[in-house]
Regions:
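Structured beta-strand-rich core segments of catalytic domains in phosphoester-bond hydrolases
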Residues: 37, 45-106
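N-terminal, active-site-proximal structural segment of metallo-dependent hydrolase catalytic domains
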Residues: 1-50, 65, 81
Length: 106
């Protein structure tokens, strides 16, 4: 299994700089992304669901601030959005995908 991680410092800007091509060339099973700095409902499907991946995102409440995501080739058994602590979950900093034998967090 290949896992990659990247701080995109703004998903829209990263897409403009070739992020989707980078993603396609990684041949990773899971890609963790940090600092998406966007609300996922505002993103195009090409960003949410790039070819071969399902995208999962946890947005920050504050516009243009933090946020994390996971691009997964295989659909996880479960996704955990946040840690369950409202005082920190509003920043959109923890997203976990659970599989049969492991979990991965972004």
């Amino acid at each position: 299994m290949k896992i990659a991680t990247i701080n995109v410092n703004g998903i829209r800007e990263a897409v403009g700089r070739g992020f989707l091509d980078w993603l396609a060339n990684q041949d990773a099973d899971v890609v963790c992304v940090q600092n998406i700095k966007a609300k996922s409902f505002e993103l195009d499907d090409s960003i949410l669901y790039p070819e071969g991946y399902e995208g999962y995102f946890l947005d920050a409440e504050q516009d243009g601030f933090s946020g994390v995501g996971l691009y997964c080739r295989k659909i996880p058994k479960a996704i955990m959005y946040g840690l369950g602590f409202p005082q920190c979950d509003h920043e959109g900093r923890f997203l976990q995908a659970d599989y049969d034998r492991f979990s991965i967090a972004s």
